[in-house]
Curated annotation (Swiss-Prot):
Biological or metabolic pathway of the protein: Carbohydrate degradation; pentose phosphate pathway; D-glyceraldehyde 3-phosphate and beta-D-fructose 6-phosphate from D-ribose 5-phosphate and D-xylulose 5-phosphate (non-oxidative stage): step 2/3
Active site: 83 (schiff-base intermediate with substrate)
A GO biological process held by the record: carbohydrate metabolic process
Transmembrane segments: none
Family per record: Belongs to the transaldolase family. Type 3B subfamily.
Taxonomic source organism: Sinorhizobium medicae (strain WSM419) (Ensifer medicae)
GO molecular function, one term: aldehyde-lyase activity
Catalytic reaction(s) noted: D-sedoheptulose 7-phosphate + D-glyceraldehyde 3-phosphate = D-erythrose 4-phosphate + beta-D-fructose 6-phosphate
CDD domains from the UniProt entry: Transaldolase_FSA (cd00956)
Subcellular location: Cytoplasm
Domain of life: Bacteria
Function: Transaldolase is important for the balance of metabolites in the pentose-phosphate pathway.
Record's protein name: Probable transaldolase
Keyword Transferase set for record: yes
Length: 217
């Protein structure tokens, strides 16, 4: 499974990338607002830190305007992945962009039917939103499961990018089902390492080692 971080905070991105665990970054207009920086400036810096795909989202809703914004975003860096909404115009733009060799991430996916269309349009990634479905009492993991089954049925190469991930359990369940990628906030990715027995065991080992009076180096 690939790990993407869902943020436009350069400090968090750099910290996670230095761990060697980061495969890419996803951003959106809300995260750019939170970062409080110019979209081109911050996206360019992110692309210089991370070698993998960096999703930058168009804000236009009509095909020709989407293509114009996509052209501008793609000039920022070679590892830009154009993020598009799952609408008819977004799918049309996806088809055109992938045909031209661009990476694409079709976002705001809430149904298997939508995911099927994204794959037909040649999307590099499709982003089903787990947490937002959970919010309306629909099991978001069921959607990941359905998409995985459909893509496997037909051999689609579109990667399932599990999004709106809020808990470490979301990450585990997505991995068990077979999502190709998970994108999560920095805090959620860092929380994956945590377990009380790990902390307790380390504390015991260190206490016992101190009693030996030895040093390794």
């Amino acid at each position: 499974m690939k790990f993407f971080v869902d943020t436009a905070d350069v400090k968090d991105i750099r910290e996670l990338n230095d761990l060697g665990l980061l495969d890419g970054v996803t951003t959106n207009p809300s995260l750019i607002l939170k970062a409080g920086r110019d979209i081109v400036e911050v996206t360019k810096e992110i692309c210089s830190i991370v070698e993998g795909p960096v999703s930058a989202e168009v804000t236009a809703t009509e095909y020709s305007a989407m293509m114009k914004e996509a052209a501008a975003l793609s000039k920022i860096a070679d590892n830009i992945c154009i993020k598009l909404p799952l609408t008819l115009d977004g799918l049309k733009a996806c088809k055109a962009l992938t045909s031209d060799g661009h990476q694409t991430n079709v976002t705001l996916c809430f149904s298997a039917n939508q995911a099927l269309l994204a794959a037909k349009a040649g999307a590099t990634f499709v982003s089903p939103f787990i947490g937002r479905l959970d919010d309306i009492a629909v099991d978001g993991m069921d959607l990941i499961r359905e998409i995985r089954h459909i893509y496997d049925n037909y051999g689609y190469e579109t990667e399932i990018l599990a999004a709106s991930v809020r808990t470490v359990n979301h990450v585990k369940e997505a991995a068990l089902i077979g999502a190709d990628v998970v994108t999560a906030p920095p805090a959620t990715l860092k929380a994956l390492v945590k377990h009380p027995l790990t902390d307790k065991g380390l504390e015991t080992f260190l206490a016992d080692w101190a009693k030996t009076g030895q040093k390794i180096a």
